[in-house]
Amino acid sequence: MRPFQSLLLLVCSALLGSCANSRFTTTPPAWAFWKPNRFDRHGRETGRWRTYYDDQKKQPYTAGRYRHGRPVQTFRYYDPTGKPDRSETYRQDGYCEVSYWHPGGQLARRGPAQWVTGPGKAPRFYWYGTWTSYEPNGQISAVQIYADGTLTRAETYKDGQLTEVEVFEHNWRSRVETYSNGQLLKVETFEKGLRVGTTSTL
């Protein structure tokens, strides 16, 4: 075989190999980055994500974004009729503010939560801090306080007035205070959910 024929064969082989390898490249084309519901090379959700109640993708269920398998910015959830059900606005380190909505679009409940995930960690989503519930007219109906996902205190309101306070210890109700027109009427104490004492304040 002549030298120039050997060189030509070598060049052709290189070109064919390059074309073959380009079909199996790990880098997707630029347009693929705009497609929703993608995974990165580690199998983690990334970019825009959309899920639906139906196979025809006419009834949205969730809409949001992921980065390295963690939700970022604002995730929105919808009920089967298409109305907003709740939203989760994420900040750094998995902290987020969660809002629930009445069917009419008014704020129903809001409070902080945290999404914990990472290497060697089981994914966990829990509430903490103060959660406030509202009537459709905007009046407060309840205030609950959570510590690491566990309810520690619950306040109930009627027409904007405090009516009851419940205190919890180790997932057991330990104390109940009853109010009327802002005045404390009665205090009940509990041990492991069983009432052990009642005190009237009148």
Where are these regions (language model features)?
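Bacterial N-terminal signal peptides
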Residues: L8-L15
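Bacterial N-terminal signal peptides that target proteins for export
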Residues: M1-L8
